[in-house]
A protein has these predicted regions:
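Short acidic, glycine/serine/threonine-rich helix-capping segments at coil-helix boundaries
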Residues: 357-364, 372-416
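Sec/Tat signal peptide C-region and signal peptidase I cleavage site
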Residues: 23-27
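Acidic, Ser/Thr/Pro/Gly-enriched interdomain connector segments
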Residues: 313-318, 322-325, 334-384
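An acidic, Gly/Ser/Thr/Pro-rich helix-cap/linker signature
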Residues: 28-120
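Flexible, glycine-rich surface segments
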Residues: 181, 188-193, 198-321
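Acidic/His-rich structured neighborhood in mature extracellular/periplasmic domains
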Residues: 88-233, 243
Length: 418
């Protein structure tokens, strides 16, 4: 994945995570944009080299009457109000609901997934893990018209050159008939489909797996799953290798060399005293691995310890390449494990180093119901912790003598239930 793409995906991930976990939290007014300048920009783009694969008729057809969407410019420059602790991130992305839905999807599509594995080498549960984290198994595809968003970002704001490439690719998708115009919707940054591809990624990795002549990653689950596997295969996924596993560190272990990229042979980790989380010997399923400690240096609330630790291999890197975040990759990895292991619980063997763990979506809804019962105007109890919910949380935290940071955690939920 090229650096501009990774940077945009990283930015989009931060905001998408904020929207997913905290809801719509941005109240800033969008800037005014000059529609005449927008039309002039589109006219210049039509004849540029970046759009040489889009014919004049298609360009006109898909941009005629198009108006800019200034709200995407706010999102382009917006930073999350605060960084989510990893335990909050994982609590929402890998909760009982998503695991149950993932196991159902895994069972429903197992024949298709096995055929995809035969062709790409990517394990079925890993593909399902990506699907679950990216769109909640197709339930959250985003609702912004890609052509409008990408056209706006191509003409205003930062990184116009990058977005022009994505805009051209989006028009080409429509020109070739892979996706219907009304179905080409997604995130503000241009990601779309069941597993949220950028348009340029579509042309590198999208697959027509159902044989209908179109690479439809929006409405064709087989196409979307096969395309996801193709992306991971292109990123270097190794057939038959696990992404890694949770481990137990020996007392007093020096973690200064921890890091996903600091790989050592598995035997070296054995000699250093590491075991699997249950105390058994490390398996030989990975030739080498790096030590990932997501919460190192991030303990909270007086809790000690390092939290869960993992040895991760090359296949973890392919998950990281999908969205340039170790927490994101870990969410996929854990979800993929649970999908393939019925009966396993969502918690890691080692608890997170906090005395106030995060909430699942069901617990978020319970928290919101309690806030509604106390008279707070937060809309519905939908499990999305947005701006209104966070303001209500701050009010209740102040009343309860807690730090008014707007964070939804187990302590606040317990206090409101008393």
């Amino acid at each position: 994945m090229n650096k501009p793409f990774a940077a945009i995906r990283r930015s989009a991930l931060a905001l998408a995570s904020t929207t997913l976990l905290l809801g719509s939290a941005f109240a800033q007014e969008p800037p005014a944009v000059d529609e005449a300048a927008f039309r002039s920009c589109l006219a210049q783009l039509q004849g540029s080299s970046a759009f040489r694969a889009v014919d004049a008729a298609s360009f006109t057809r898909f941009t005629q009457g198009l108006a800019p969407d200034p709200s995407v410019l706010v999102l382009l420059d917006r930073q999350p109000e605060f960084t989510l602790p990893v335990w909050d991130y994982i609590a929402v992305l890998v909760d009982d609901e998503r695991v149950a839905d993932g196991r159902a999807a895994y069972a429903k599509w197992q024949d298709t997934l096995r055929r995809i594995e035969q062709q790409t080498g990517v394990a079925p549960n890993v593909v399902v893990g990506v699907w679950g984290v990216e769109s909640n198994f197709g339930q959250n595809l985003g609702g912004r018209p890609l052509v409008q968003s990408l056209a706006t970002l191509s003409c205003f704001g930062r990184r116009q050159a990058y977005f022009r490439g994505e805009f051209a690719a989006a028009l080409r998708i429509l020109q070739e008939g892979h996706i219907a115009p009304d179905k080409l919707v997604g995130s503000w940054a241009g990601a779309f489909g069941q597993t949220q591809f950028m348009p340029s990624t579509f042309f590198r990795s999208a697959v027509d797996f159902d044989g209908d002549g179109r690479r439809d990653i929006v409405d064709s689950v087989p196409d979307a799953l096969a395309s996801t596997a193709k992306f991971l295969q292109n990123a270097g996924y190794r057939r038959g290798e696990p992404w890694g596993f949770e481990v137990q560190l020996p007392p007093g272990f020096d973690t200064s060399d921890a890091g996903r990229k600091n790989r050592r042979p598995i035997d070296a980790w054995r000699r250093a005293g590491l075991t699997l989380a249950d105390g058994s010997a490390l398996p030989d399923t990975l030739p080498s691995a790096g030590l990932l400690i997501p919460a190192r240096g991030r303990s909270a609330g007086g809790a000690g310890g390092l939290g869960p630790a993992f040895l991760v291999g090359r296949n973890f890197d392919t998950l990281y390449s999908y969205n340039a975040s170790e927490n994101y990759a870990l969410a996929i990895a854990q979800l993929s494990n649970l999908v393939a292991n019925p009966g396993a619980g969502v918690a890691f063997a080692t608890p997170w180093p906090t005395d106030d763990p995060g909430l699942s979506r069901a617990q978020n809804r319970e928290l919101q119901s309690l806030l509604l019962a106390r008279g707070h105007d937060i809309g519905s109890a939908d499990g999305m912790i947005g701006a209104k919910t966070r303001e209500a949380i701050k009010t209740e935290q102040q009343r309860l003598g807690m730090k008014p940071d707007g964070r939804a955690g187990q302590k606040l939920l317990a206090a409101l239930k008393r």
